[in-house]
Swiss-Prot record:
<feature type="compositionally biased region" description="Low complexity">
    <location>
        <begin position="324"/>
        <end position="336"/>
    </location>
</feature>
<dbReference type="GO" id="GO:0005634">
    <property type="term" value="C:nucleus"/>
</dbReference>
<comment type="subunit">
    <text>Interacts with HUS1, HUS1B, RAD1, RAD9A and RAD17.</text>
</comment>
<dbReference type="GO" id="GO:0031573">
    <property type="term" value="P:mitotic intra-S DNA damage checkpoint signaling"/>
</dbReference>
<feature type="compositionally biased region" description="Polar residues">
    <location>
        <begin position="272"/>
        <end position="281"/>
    </location>
</feature>
<dbReference type="InterPro" id="IPR046938">
    <property type="entry name" value="DNA_clamp_sf"/>
</dbReference>
<keyword id="KW-0597">Phosphoprotein</keyword>
<dbReference type="InterPro" id="IPR007268">
    <property type="entry name" value="Rad9/Ddc1"/>
</dbReference>
<feature type="modified residue" description="Phosphoserine">
    <location>
        <position position="358"/>
    </location>
</feature>
<dbReference type="InterPro" id="IPR026584">
    <property type="entry name" value="Rad9"/>
</dbReference>
<comment type="similarity">
    <text>Belongs to the rad9 family.</text>
</comment>
<dbReference type="GO" id="GO:0006281">
    <property type="term" value="P:DNA repair"/>
</dbReference>
<dbReference type="GO" id="GO:0000076">
    <property type="term" value="P:DNA replication checkpoint signaling"/>
</dbReference>
<protein>
    <recommendedName>
        <fullName>Cell cycle checkpoint control protein RAD9B</fullName>
    </recommendedName>
</protein>
<dbReference type="GO" id="GO:0030896">
    <property type="term" value="C:checkpoint clamp complex"/>
</dbReference>
<dbReference type="GO" id="GO:0071479">
    <property type="term" value="P:cellular response to ionizing radiation"/>
</dbReference>
<feature type="modified residue" description="Phosphoserine">
    <location>
        <position position="349"/>
    </location>
</feature>
Length: 398
Protein backbone atom coordinates (compact mmCIF):
# COMPACT_ATOMS: atom_id res chain seq x y z
CA UNK A 1 0.00 0.00 0.00
CA UNK A 2 1.06 3.57 -0.65
CA UNK A 3 0.63 6.49 1.74
CA UNK A 4 -2.84 7.36 0.45
CA UNK A 5 -4.00 3.76 0.73
CA UNK A 6 -2.60 3.55 4.25
CA UNK A 7 -4.75 6.55 5.23
CA UNK A 8 -7.94 4.88 3.99
CA UNK A 9 -7.02 1.56 5.60
CA UNK A 10 -6.21 3.26 8.90
CA UNK A 11 -9.44 5.25 8.83
CA UNK A 12 -11.37 1.99 8.48
CA UNK A 13 -9.63 0.62 11.57
CA UNK A 14 -10.41 3.80 13.50
CA UNK A 15 -14.06 3.57 12.47
CA UNK A 16 -14.36 -0.06 13.56
CA UNK A 17 -12.70 0.79 16.87
CA UNK A 18 -15.90 2.67 17.77
CA UNK A 19 -17.77 -0.64 17.62
CA UNK A 20 -15.69 -3.06 19.67
CA UNK A 21 -12.36 -3.75 21.35
CA UNK A 22 -11.73 -6.63 18.95
CA UNK A 23 -11.02 -6.68 15.22
CA UNK A 24 -11.03 -9.56 12.76
CA UNK A 25 -8.81 -9.68 9.69
CA UNK A 26 -10.56 -12.04 7.29
CA UNK A 27 -8.54 -12.51 4.07
CA UNK A 28 -10.15 -14.28 1.15
CA UNK A 29 -9.87 -14.54 -2.60
CA UNK A 30 -12.04 -11.43 -3.05
CA UNK A 31 -9.93 -9.27 -0.76
CA UNK A 32 -9.26 -8.39 2.85
CA UNK A 33 -12.29 -7.94 5.13
CA UNK A 34 -12.25 -6.16 8.48
CA UNK A 35 -15.03 -7.14 10.89
CA UNK A 36 -16.08 -5.97 14.32
CA UNK A 37 -19.07 -6.60 16.59
CA UNK A 38 -19.79 -5.19 20.04
CA UNK A 39 -20.30 -7.29 23.16
CA UNK A 40 -24.11 -7.00 23.24
CA UNK A 41 -24.42 -7.85 19.53
CA UNK A 42 -26.30 -4.66 18.70
CA UNK A 43 -23.72 -3.17 16.31
CA UNK A 44 -21.81 -4.90 13.52
CA UNK A 45 -19.18 -3.28 11.31
CA UNK A 46 -17.79 -4.67 8.08
CA UNK A 47 -15.27 -3.23 5.60
CA UNK A 48 -14.15 -5.22 2.55
CA UNK A 49 -11.08 -4.05 0.62
CA UNK A 50 -11.08 -5.67 -2.79
CA UNK A 51 -7.88 -7.17 -4.15
CA UNK A 52 -7.49 -4.28 -6.63
CA UNK A 53 -7.35 -1.79 -3.73
CA UNK A 54 -3.82 -2.96 -2.93
CA UNK A 55 -0.82 -2.59 -5.18
CA UNK A 56 -0.09 -6.25 -4.55
CA UNK A 57 -2.42 -8.78 -2.93
CA UNK A 58 -1.60 -12.46 -2.47
CA UNK A 59 -3.92 -14.88 -0.72
CA UNK A 60 -3.63 -18.59 -0.04
CA UNK A 61 -5.83 -20.75 2.21
CA UNK A 62 -4.36 -21.74 5.52
CA UNK A 63 -5.59 -25.33 5.13
CA UNK A 64 -8.04 -27.47 3.20
CA UNK A 65 -10.58 -30.06 4.21
CA UNK A 66 -9.35 -33.42 2.92
CA UNK A 67 -12.70 -34.86 1.87
CA UNK A 68 -13.99 -31.96 -0.25
CA UNK A 69 -10.86 -29.81 -0.66
CA UNK A 70 -12.67 -26.75 0.67
CA UNK A 71 -10.16 -23.98 1.48
CA UNK A 72 -10.12 -22.64 5.02
CA UNK A 73 -9.43 -18.94 5.45
CA UNK A 74 -7.01 -17.58 7.98
CA UNK A 75 -9.05 -15.79 10.65
CA UNK A 76 -7.07 -13.27 12.68
CA UNK A 77 -8.68 -11.88 15.82
CA UNK A 78 -6.73 -8.85 17.04
CA UNK A 79 -7.07 -6.64 20.07
CA UNK A 80 -7.98 -3.18 18.82
CA UNK A 81 -5.63 -1.56 21.35
CA UNK A 82 -2.68 -3.37 19.76
CA UNK A 83 -3.31 -2.27 16.17
CA UNK A 84 -5.00 1.11 16.63
CA UNK A 85 -1.83 3.00 17.77
CA UNK A 86 -0.07 1.88 14.60
CA UNK A 87 -2.60 3.77 12.44
CA UNK A 88 -3.27 6.71 14.74
CA UNK A 89 -1.44 9.58 12.96
CA UNK A 90 -2.85 9.07 9.46
CA UNK A 91 -1.87 12.46 8.04
CA UNK A 92 1.74 11.85 9.04
CA UNK A 93 1.69 8.36 7.53
CA UNK A 94 0.25 9.70 4.28
CA UNK A 95 3.07 12.23 3.92
CA UNK A 96 6.04 10.21 5.15
CA UNK A 97 5.31 6.60 4.17
CA UNK A 98 6.24 5.42 0.70
CA UNK A 99 5.14 1.82 1.11
CA UNK A 100 3.43 -0.39 3.69
CA UNK A 101 3.37 -4.18 3.73
CA UNK A 102 1.24 -6.56 5.80
CA UNK A 103 2.02 -10.27 6.10
CA UNK A 104 -0.02 -12.73 8.17
CA UNK A 105 1.98 -15.67 9.49
CA UNK A 106 -0.31 -18.54 10.44
CA UNK A 107 2.54 -20.65 11.82
CA UNK A 108 3.55 -17.94 14.30
CA UNK A 109 0.06 -16.43 14.83
CA UNK A 110 1.15 -12.89 14.13
CA UNK A 111 0.68 -10.12 11.59
CA UNK A 112 3.83 -8.29 10.52
CA UNK A 113 3.24 -4.66 9.47
CA UNK A 114 6.18 -2.77 7.96
CA UNK A 115 6.37 0.91 7.01
CA UNK A 116 9.03 2.03 4.55
CA UNK A 117 9.65 5.76 4.83
CA UNK A 118 11.99 8.28 3.35
CA UNK A 119 15.76 8.17 3.83
CA UNK A 120 15.66 4.39 4.22
CA UNK A 121 13.72 4.41 7.50
CA UNK A 122 11.83 1.18 8.17
CA UNK A 123 9.42 0.46 11.04
CA UNK A 124 8.26 -3.06 11.86
CA UNK A 125 5.30 -3.99 14.07
CA UNK A 126 4.53 -7.55 15.16
CA UNK A 127 0.89 -7.94 16.20
CA UNK A 128 -0.10 -11.31 17.60
CA UNK A 129 -3.55 -12.66 16.82
CA UNK A 130 -5.88 -15.47 17.83
CA UNK A 131 -7.22 -17.83 15.19
CA UNK A 132 -10.96 -17.37 15.73
CA UNK A 133 -13.90 -17.62 13.36
CA UNK A 134 -15.44 -14.18 12.77
CA UNK A 135 -19.14 -13.47 13.07
CA UNK A 136 -20.82 -12.96 9.69
CA UNK A 137 -24.24 -11.36 9.29
CA UNK A 138 -26.65 -12.11 6.45
CA UNK A 139 -29.00 -9.16 6.08
CA UNK A 140 -30.71 -8.30 2.78
CA UNK A 141 -30.65 -4.51 2.92
CA UNK A 142 -32.19 -4.11 -0.53
CA UNK A 143 -35.52 -5.39 0.84
CA UNK A 144 -35.90 -2.45 3.23
CA UNK A 145 -38.86 -0.17 2.58
CA UNK A 146 -36.87 3.05 3.09
CA UNK A 147 -33.65 3.68 1.15
CA UNK A 148 -31.87 7.04 1.29
CA UNK A 149 -28.58 8.16 -0.23
CA UNK A 150 -26.97 11.45 0.71
CA UNK A 151 -23.58 13.16 0.53
CA UNK A 152 -21.68 12.72 3.81
CA UNK A 153 -20.75 16.40 4.05
CA UNK A 154 -24.40 17.46 4.14
CA UNK A 155 -25.27 14.96 6.85
CA UNK A 156 -22.13 15.85 8.82
CA UNK A 157 -23.16 19.51 8.89
CA UNK A 158 -26.54 18.46 10.26
CA UNK A 159 -25.18 16.31 13.11
CA UNK A 160 -22.84 19.15 14.07
CA UNK A 161 -25.91 20.76 15.64
CA UNK A 162 -26.16 17.93 18.16
CA UNK A 163 -24.38 18.16 21.48
CA UNK A 164 -21.16 16.24 22.09
CA UNK A 165 -22.69 14.15 24.89
CA UNK A 166 -25.55 12.99 22.67
CA UNK A 167 -25.83 9.19 22.79
CA UNK A 168 -28.72 8.58 20.39
CA UNK A 169 -30.06 10.18 17.24
CA UNK A 170 -33.49 9.92 15.63
CA UNK A 171 -34.39 9.75 11.93
CA UNK A 172 -37.98 10.56 10.97
CA UNK A 173 -39.05 10.16 7.34
CA UNK A 174 -42.12 10.77 5.22
CA UNK A 175 -42.41 10.82 1.42
CA UNK A 176 -42.08 14.64 1.56
CA UNK A 177 -39.51 15.15 4.31
CA UNK A 178 -36.52 13.77 6.21
CA UNK A 179 -35.96 14.98 9.77
CA UNK A 180 -32.85 14.46 11.90
CA UNK A 181 -33.24 15.26 15.58
CA UNK A 182 -31.68 14.58 18.92
CA UNK A 183 -33.32 11.83 20.91
CA UNK A 184 -35.31 13.20 23.84
CA UNK A 185 -35.26 9.94 25.84
CA UNK A 186 -38.09 9.32 28.27
CA UNK A 187 -38.88 13.02 28.73
CA UNK A 188 -37.68 16.33 27.38
CA UNK A 189 -36.64 18.90 29.98
CA UNK A 190 -36.28 22.20 28.13
CA UNK A 191 -34.61 23.83 31.14
CA UNK A 192 -31.62 21.47 31.32
CA UNK A 193 -31.30 19.93 27.84
CA UNK A 194 -30.75 21.04 24.26
CA UNK A 195 -33.10 19.74 21.59
CA UNK A 196 -31.95 20.04 17.97
CA UNK A 197 -33.84 19.26 14.80
CA UNK A 198 -33.09 19.71 11.10
CA UNK A 199 -35.23 18.82 8.08
CA UNK A 200 -34.23 18.00 4.51
CA UNK A 201 -36.30 17.85 1.37
CA UNK A 202 -36.10 14.95 -1.10
CA UNK A 203 -34.13 17.15 -3.50
CA UNK A 204 -31.18 17.16 -1.07
CA UNK A 205 -30.68 13.41 -1.53
CA UNK A 206 -29.04 11.54 -4.36
CA UNK A 207 -31.68 8.84 -3.92
CA UNK A 208 -34.87 9.12 -1.85
CA UNK A 209 -37.27 6.18 -1.48
CA UNK A 210 -39.72 6.13 1.44
CA UNK A 211 -42.19 3.26 1.49
CA UNK A 212 -43.09 3.52 5.17
CA UNK A 213 -43.53 6.60 7.35
CA UNK A 214 -41.43 5.79 10.38
CA UNK A 215 -39.15 7.13 13.09
CA UNK A 216 -36.10 5.20 14.26
CA UNK A 217 -33.59 5.87 17.04
CA UNK A 218 -30.10 4.38 17.19
CA UNK A 219 -26.61 5.04 18.59
CA UNK A 220 -24.98 8.29 17.57
CA UNK A 221 -21.34 7.23 17.96
CA UNK A 222 -21.32 4.78 15.05
CA UNK A 223 -23.04 7.29 12.77
CA UNK A 224 -20.26 9.82 13.32
CA UNK A 225 -17.64 7.18 12.62
CA UNK A 226 -19.00 6.04 9.27
CA UNK A 227 -19.61 9.65 8.20
CA UNK A 228 -15.93 10.41 8.78
CA UNK A 229 -14.95 7.31 6.82
CA UNK A 230 -17.24 8.17 3.90
CA UNK A 231 -15.79 11.69 3.74
CA UNK A 232 -12.33 10.22 3.31
CA UNK A 233 -13.65 8.03 0.50
CA UNK A 234 -15.59 10.94 -1.09
CA UNK A 235 -18.50 8.54 -1.58
CA UNK A 236 -22.19 9.00 -0.67
CA UNK A 237 -23.62 7.19 2.30
CA UNK A 238 -26.70 4.97 1.88
CA UNK A 239 -29.22 4.37 4.68
CA UNK A 240 -31.52 1.32 4.70
CA UNK A 241 -34.22 0.86 7.36
CA UNK A 242 -37.84 -0.18 7.98
CA UNK A 243 -39.53 0.46 11.33
CA UNK A 244 -38.40 0.69 15.00
CA UNK A 245 -36.97 -2.56 16.27
CA UNK A 246 -35.46 -3.65 12.95
CA UNK A 247 -31.81 -2.88 12.16
CA UNK A 248 -30.69 0.16 10.20
CA UNK A 249 -27.83 -0.26 7.72
CA UNK A 250 -25.36 2.53 6.95
CA UNK A 251 -23.42 1.63 3.82
CA UNK A 252 -20.62 3.13 1.73
CA UNK A 253 -19.78 1.46 -1.56
CA UNK A 254 -16.95 2.17 -3.95
CA UNK A 255 -15.24 0.31 -6.77
CA UNK A 256 -12.34 -0.51 -4.43
CA UNK A 257 -14.10 -1.21 -1.15
CA UNK A 258 -17.45 -1.75 0.57
CA UNK A 259 -18.32 -0.73 4.13
CA UNK A 260 -21.51 -1.53 6.05
CA UNK A 261 -22.63 -0.87 9.60
CA UNK A 262 -25.67 -2.72 10.94
CA UNK A 263 -27.11 -1.00 14.00
CA UNK A 264 -29.95 -2.04 16.28
CA UNK A 265 -32.75 0.52 16.62
CA UNK A 266 -34.70 1.48 19.71
CA UNK A 267 -37.94 -0.40 20.18
CA UNK A 268 -40.45 2.18 21.43
CA UNK A 269 -43.73 0.25 21.21
CA UNK A 270 -46.17 2.72 22.86
CA UNK A 271 -45.09 5.64 20.67
CA UNK A 272 -45.59 3.81 17.38
CA UNK A 273 -48.65 5.13 15.64
CA UNK A 274 -49.13 2.03 13.54
CA UNK A 275 -47.53 -1.39 13.62
CA UNK A 276 -46.66 -3.31 10.44
CA UNK A 277 -49.68 -5.56 11.03
CA UNK A 278 -52.03 -2.59 11.21
CA UNK A 279 -50.46 -1.09 8.10
CA UNK A 280 -51.11 -4.26 6.15
CA UNK A 281 -54.64 -4.43 7.53
CA UNK A 282 -55.35 -0.83 6.59
CA UNK A 283 -54.06 -1.41 3.07
CA UNK A 284 -56.34 -4.44 2.72
CA UNK A 285 -59.31 -2.45 3.93
CA UNK A 286 -58.60 0.40 1.54
CA UNK A 287 -58.46 -2.06 -1.34
CA UNK A 288 -61.84 -3.60 -0.35
CA UNK A 289 -64.77 -1.12 -0.46
CA UNK A 290 -66.92 -3.43 1.69
CA UNK A 291 -64.39 -3.46 4.50
CA UNK A 292 -63.79 0.28 4.21
CA UNK A 293 -67.52 0.92 4.55
CA UNK A 294 -67.69 -1.23 7.65
CA UNK A 295 -64.71 0.61 9.08
CA UNK A 296 -66.77 3.81 9.26
CA UNK A 297 -69.15 2.17 11.76
CA UNK A 298 -66.43 1.64 14.40
CA UNK A 299 -66.85 3.54 17.64
CA UNK A 300 -64.17 5.82 19.02
CA UNK A 301 -62.93 5.84 22.59
CA UNK A 302 -62.86 9.20 24.36
CA UNK A 303 -59.48 10.76 25.19
CA UNK A 304 -58.71 11.72 28.80
CA UNK A 305 -55.67 13.51 30.28
CA UNK A 306 -54.65 10.34 32.15
CA UNK A 307 -54.63 7.98 29.15
CA UNK A 308 -55.22 8.30 25.42
CA UNK A 309 -56.97 5.24 24.06
CA UNK A 310 -57.17 4.05 20.48
CA UNK A 311 -60.35 2.79 18.87
CA UNK A 312 -60.98 -0.76 19.99
CA UNK A 313 -61.20 -3.21 17.07
CA UNK A 314 -64.60 -4.79 16.58
CA UNK A 315 -66.36 -7.05 14.11
CA UNK A 316 -66.08 -6.01 10.50
CA UNK A 317 -69.86 -6.21 10.02
CA UNK A 318 -71.62 -4.91 13.17
CA UNK A 319 -75.38 -5.40 13.18
CA UNK A 320 -76.20 -2.54 15.54
CA UNK A 321 -74.30 0.60 16.53
CA UNK A 322 -72.52 -0.22 19.79
CA UNK A 323 -73.38 1.82 22.86
CA UNK A 324 -71.03 2.92 25.60
CA UNK A 325 -71.51 -0.22 27.72
CA UNK A 326 -70.83 -2.56 24.80
CA UNK A 327 -67.76 -0.52 23.89
CA UNK A 328 -66.37 -1.04 27.40
CA UNK A 329 -67.06 -4.79 27.16
CA UNK A 330 -65.36 -4.90 23.78
CA UNK A 331 -62.27 -3.22 25.21
CA UNK A 332 -62.08 -5.81 27.98
CA UNK A 333 -62.62 -8.66 25.55
CA UNK A 334 -60.04 -7.35 23.08
CA UNK A 335 -57.28 -7.80 25.66
CA UNK A 336 -57.77 -11.59 25.57
CA UNK A 337 -57.86 -11.94 21.80
CA UNK A 338 -54.77 -13.08 19.90
CA UNK A 339 -55.66 -12.14 16.32
CA UNK A 340 -56.09 -8.38 16.64
CA UNK A 341 -53.69 -5.89 15.12
CA UNK A 342 -53.76 -3.26 17.88
CA UNK A 343 -54.48 -3.24 21.61
CA UNK A 344 -55.88 -0.11 23.29
CA UNK A 345 -53.31 1.54 25.50
CA UNK A 346 -55.92 2.03 28.26
CA UNK A 347 -56.29 -1.75 28.53
CA UNK A 348 -52.53 -2.12 28.81
CA UNK A 349 -52.38 0.54 31.51
CA UNK A 350 -55.14 -1.21 33.50
CA UNK A 351 -53.27 -4.52 33.32
CA UNK A 352 -50.06 -2.91 34.54
CA UNK A 353 -51.56 -1.23 37.63
CA UNK A 354 -49.98 -2.43 40.84
CA UNK A 355 -46.82 -3.59 39.08
CA UNK A 356 -43.42 -1.97 39.29
CA UNK A 357 -42.78 0.31 36.31
CA UNK A 358 -40.48 -1.09 33.69
CA UNK A 359 -38.91 0.88 30.83
CA UNK A 360 -40.59 0.23 27.48
CA UNK A 361 -37.87 1.93 25.47
CA UNK A 362 -35.37 -0.80 24.73
CA UNK A 363 -32.83 -1.64 22.04
CA UNK A 364 -33.83 -4.77 20.17
CA UNK A 365 -30.83 -7.06 19.83
CA UNK A 366 -30.74 -7.85 16.13
CA UNK A 367 -28.97 -11.20 16.59
CA UNK A 368 -31.10 -12.70 19.38
CA UNK A 369 -34.39 -10.83 18.87
CA UNK A 370 -34.74 -9.53 22.44
CA UNK A 371 -38.03 -7.64 22.62
CA UNK A 372 -40.04 -6.27 25.50
CA UNK A 373 -42.55 -8.43 27.34
CA UNK A 374 -45.38 -6.05 26.48
CA UNK A 375 -44.84 -6.57 22.76
CA UNK A 376 -44.66 -10.34 23.06
CA UNK A 377 -48.06 -10.34 24.75
CA UNK A 378 -49.88 -8.03 22.33
CA UNK A 379 -48.09 -8.41 18.99
CA UNK A 380 -49.29 -11.26 16.78
CA UNK A 381 -46.15 -11.22 14.64
CA UNK A 382 -42.94 -10.46 16.55
CA UNK A 383 -40.20 -8.49 14.89
CA UNK A 384 -37.90 -10.51 12.69
CA UNK A 385 -34.42 -11.32 13.92
CA UNK A 386 -31.36 -12.76 12.29
CA UNK A 387 -31.13 -15.71 14.71
CA UNK A 388 -33.38 -17.56 17.12
CA UNK A 389 -33.21 -16.42 20.73
CA UNK A 390 -31.27 -18.60 23.12
CA UNK A 391 -32.96 -20.54 25.92
CA UNK A 392 -31.54 -18.29 28.62
CA UNK A 393 -32.90 -15.19 26.91
CA UNK A 394 -36.33 -16.75 26.47
CA UNK A 395 -36.45 -17.52 30.19
CA UNK A 396 -35.36 -13.99 31.04
CA UNK A 397 -37.91 -12.37 28.72
CA UNK A 398 -40.71 -14.60 30.00
Amino acid sequence: MTGGQVKVFGKAIQTLSRVSDELWLDPSEKGLALRSVNSCHSTYGYVLFSSVFFQHYQWSPSATITDSDIPLNLNCKLAIKSILPIFRCLNYLERSIEKCTMVARSDRCRVVIQFFGRHGIKRTHNVYFQDCQPLKILFEKSLCANILMIKPRLLAEAIALLTSNQEEVTFSVTPENFCLKSSSGESLDLTSSVYSEMSFGPEEFDFFQVGLDTEITFCFKELKGILTFSEVMHAPIAIYFDFPGKPVVLSVEDMLLEASFILATLLDYPSRTSSPQSLRLSQARRSDPTLSGAQEGKSRVSQTPESISRAAPKRLFPKDPPDSSSAAETRRASASQDDISEVPESVVSDMEEGQSPSPLRKFSCMFFGAVSCEQQEHANHPLGSLAVASDSEQDASG
